[in-house]
Every structure is written in structure tokens, then in C-alpha cells.
Amino acid sequence: SGSCTTKTCWTTLPKFREIGYILKEKYNAAVQVEVVRASRLRQPTFLKIKQIKSYQKPMETDLVYIEKSPNYCEEDASTGSVGTQGRLCNRTSPNADGCDMMCCGRGYNTHQYTKVWQCNCKF
């Protein structure tokens, strides 16, 4: 009869925030590994879990690390990290922008400001 059907398929990426959340969860659950050199010729080098809590082999999608992360709270000139000291934080937030987390237990100072400006109001 001359009719034609077109089928179009596409894949979309999840929202950036969702990806960030998943990566943060994986980062928090990452396990430390150490490189084990082969003792004999033709034997491959492999990674071994450094601390055995309840041994569970990491899956291909899990994160592992060889060296511990630096202390992001403190300034580190070698990496260019400025740390968190002196940054503004949200006193009521339980997230990364919150003072409890961002200030790394050092405590924080609160300041109250009054802002005055012309509003061009007409009465």
C-alpha cells in the first residue's frame, strides 16, 4: 500500500546531579588496594585489597585506590588545594556546603550583616 513506518531510538544520559551522587557514593565505598609484583617471570602483576574487613571482591564498576586522598580541609601547595579555611558555608545545610562538613570540625564564626539600598519605591 505504500505506507512507511519509521522507528527512532535514542539513549539519554542521566541528570548531572544523579551522576555526581552515584560517583560520590562509589568514592565513599572505595577500598584501598596494593600492587603485588609478580614473583615469577610471565606471572602478571595484580592488585590486592589492603585491609580485609569483610572480604568482597570489588566489581568492575567499583572504585579502588592505591594512595589515600589528601586532606581537602588543609591547604596543600603541592596540589594547589586551598583547603576550606575562610570559605563561606551554610550553617543550616547538612550537605557539603554546610559549616559542619566544610569546616572539618574546626568550628566556624557567624557574622550578621545589614544591607541598605535604594529601592526606588513610590508611595
Curated annotation (Swiss-Prot):
Glycan attachment positions: 90
Gene Ontology MF, one: cytokine activity
Domain of life: Eukaryota
Region named Disordered linker: 33-61
GO CC, any one term: extracellular space
Lipid attachment locations (O-palmitoleoyl serine): 1
First and last residue of the signal peptide: none
Subcellular location: Secreted, Extracellular space, Extracellular matrix; Secreted
Coiled-coil residue windows: none
Cystine pairs: 89-104
Function as written in the Swiss-Prot or TrEMBL entry: Ligand for members of the frizzled family of seven transmembrane receptors that functions in the canonical Wnt/beta-catenin signaling pathway. Required for normal fusion of the chorion and the allantois during placenta development. Required for central nervous system (CNS) angiogenesis and blood-brain barrier regulation.
Family under the similarity heading: Belongs to the Wnt family.
Name of the protein this chain belongs to: Protein Wnt-7b
Species the sequence originates in: Meleagris gallopavo
